[in-house]
Amino acid sequence: MSTSKRKRADEAQWNKRSTKKKGSAPQAKKPGGKVEKPSLQIQTLLHSGDTMITVPSGGVCDLINTYARGSDEGNRHTSETLTYKVGVDYHFVADAASCKYSNRGTGVMWLVYDTTPGGNAPTTQDIFAYPSALKAWPTTWKVSRELCHRFVVKRRWLFTMETDGRIGSDTPPSNQSWPPCKRNVDFHKFTSGLGVRTQWKNVTDGGVGAIQRGALYLVIAPGNGITFTAHGQTRLYFKSVGNQ
């Protein structure tokens, strides 16, 4: 082969190598591919001192999803809210009237969903329709059949309290010792997966009269007549959804 032909062949081979496509650079990931969910809002209801809860015979029913309209974390920002989780942390103390007797009772705490509150918070008897003979035995209460479409029990918890005929400030004689009893009870519960949807009227307050659909009540009833006070807090985790 002549020198000129060999030279042309070498040049052609070189050109083939130089014209090969280079590997393309990895493409940058487009931002916004995954949308982060907004964190839950939190509302805390504090009950201590003047705001402690007094639990009489027959129990008490309080609205807890009291989200007033506003811009703070504990306010609703839209016309609809979803309550996902609730935490209750309380200290129950038997009152002086109950401590006069030796007694034992099983109390109950409920979370009750009200589909159509109608402007006023119900009483425990409105929800459970118990006869007067069962007023002191809340473990026997059931939602009345006529209102089972309106009231839904989301959670139900039991607790036991005791009294021994003495109040907490009494002191035993020097030659005696008194065994402890459950006149003071710590009560802690946390629950999730509630999915309570609340539709609000076009008002700014967070009372039961502002709710069109979907109130959530904390209901507490003492057992066997051991009335008491509750000191602590309820914390609700929710989101503002729907239209402004």
From Swiss-Prot:
Gene3D superfamilies: 2.60.120.20. It is found in: Virion; Host nucleus. This is Capsid protein. Residues 1-39 are annotated as: Disordered. GO terms for molecular function: DNA binding; structural molecule activity. It comes from Maize streak virus genotype C (isolate Set). Encapsidates the viral genome into characteristic twinned ('geminate') particles. Binds the genomic viral ssDNA and shuttles it into and out of the cell nucleus. Plays a role in protection of the genome from degradation, virus acquisition and transmission by insect vectors, infectivity, and systemic movement. The CP of monopartite geminiviruses is absolutely essential for virus movement. It comes from the Viruses. A motif (Bipartite nuclear localization signal) lies at residues 1-24. GO terms for cellular component: host cell; host cell nucleus; T=1 icosahedral viral capsid. Disulfide bonds: none annotated. The lineage of its organism: Viruses, Monodnaviria, Shotokuvirae, Cressdnaviricota, Repensiviricetes. One of its GO terms (biological process) is viral penetration into host nucleus. Belongs to the geminiviridae capsid protein family. Pfam families: Gemini_coat (PF00844). Homomultimer. Interacts with the movement protein. Binds to single-stranded and double-stranded viral DNA. Keywords: Capsid protein, DNA-binding, Host nucleus, T=1 icosahedral capsid protein, Viral penetration into host nucleus, Virion, Virus entry into host cell.
